[in-house]
Amino acid sequence: MTDQELMDMAKKAAEYAYVPYSKFPVGAALECSDGTVFTGCNVDNAAYGDTICAERTAAVKAVSSGHRDFVRIAIWGNSKEYCYPCGSCRQFLQEFSKHMTVLCARSDGSFVSHKLSEMMPFFFDF
């Protein structure tokens, strides 16, 4: 699967976002080492702290299906700026793959690629 195909899946996932408060739909497509892809969208909540990001939605779907070896994640947000994962998502993802590729898009379709370890070189670990 190409980076663009994975990003297209992330953009499609954003269509399902529940964002009555933030008005900021985000979609993610997470690829596992065996090629399986899990998508996720962000889900707002009136208690803002209970909101869940698209990246963690996709990761929880993967883990709850028995997948724990992540290779790439594509993140699409409806913004003129690149949609980077928040600190909580970076910490959450590194639990499963410190060196995975993170593709961050903006609404015009362009995207950049980083290694998770570059985006969060110091993370909490036991």
Regions found by a protein language model. Give the residues of each.
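C-terminal binding/interaction regions
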Residues: 2-19, 65-126
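Active-site segments that bind and position negatively charged phosphate/pyrophosphate groups
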Residues: 22
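Short beta-strand scaffold segments in enzyme catalytic cores
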Residues: 25-32
